[in-house]
Amino acid sequence: MTTTSSKVAIKPLEDRIVVQPLDAEQTTASGLVIPDTAKEKPQEGVVLAVGPGRFEDGNRLPLDVSVGDVVLYSKYGGTEVKYNGEEYLVLSARDVLAIVEK
């Protein structure tokens, strides 16, 4: 699995990961522009940093995601964080629903 690694200067602890949400669709299939107020929260993002995993019964459990993975996550999971002008989401590994295969 993974060790602690990062593409940003944020080091998540335990079983947390830092994700950069992918932008929501700007237009509909018919070409209508979607205003920011009507956009759904994104549920897909790129993993930028991975914590070392949590301890259970004295053993550290590695995470199933790696830096660079594109993941689907719970719509209202995690904490939104702004750092150096960028927006990130800090999620527990439990909030990750799936890894998107390329």
Swiss-Prot record:
Q: Which compartments does it reside in?
A: Cytoplasm
> What SUPFAM superfamilies does UniProt report for this protein, alphabetically?
GroES-like
Q: Which CDD domains match?
A: cpn10 (cd00320)
Cross-referenced SMART domains: Cpn10 (SM00883)
Gene Ontology CC annotations of this record = cytoplasm
| Keywords (A to Z) from UniProt | Chaperone, Cytoplasm
For this UniProt entry, the molecular function terms from Gene Ontology, in alphabetical order, are: ATP binding; metal ion binding; protein folding chaperone; protein-folding chaperone binding; unfolded protein binding
Q: Which Gene Ontology terms describe the biological processes this protein takes part in?
A: chaperone cofactor-dependent protein refolding
Q: What is its main location?
A: cytoplasm
InterPro entries attached to this UniProt entry: Chaperonin_GroES (IPR020818), Chaperonin_GroES_sf (IPR037124), Chaprnonin_Cpn10_CS (IPR018369), GroES-like_sf (IPR011032)
Report the function annotation for this chain: Together with the chaperonin GroEL, plays an essential role in assisting protein folding. The GroEL-GroES system forms a nano-cage that allows encapsulation of the non-native substrate proteins and provides a physical environment optimized to promote and accelerate protein folding. GroES binds to the apical surface of the GroEL ring, thereby capping the opening of the GroEL channel.
**Assembly information from the UniProt record:** Heptamer of 7 subunits arranged in a ring. Interacts with the chaperonin GroEL.
Q: Which family does it belong to?
A: Belongs to the GroES chaperonin family.
Task: Kindly give the HAMAP family that the UniProt entry links to this protein.
Answer: CH10
Q: What is this protein called?
A: Co-chaperonin GroES
Species assigned in the record: Streptomyces coelicolor (strain ATCC BAA-471 / A3(2) / M145)
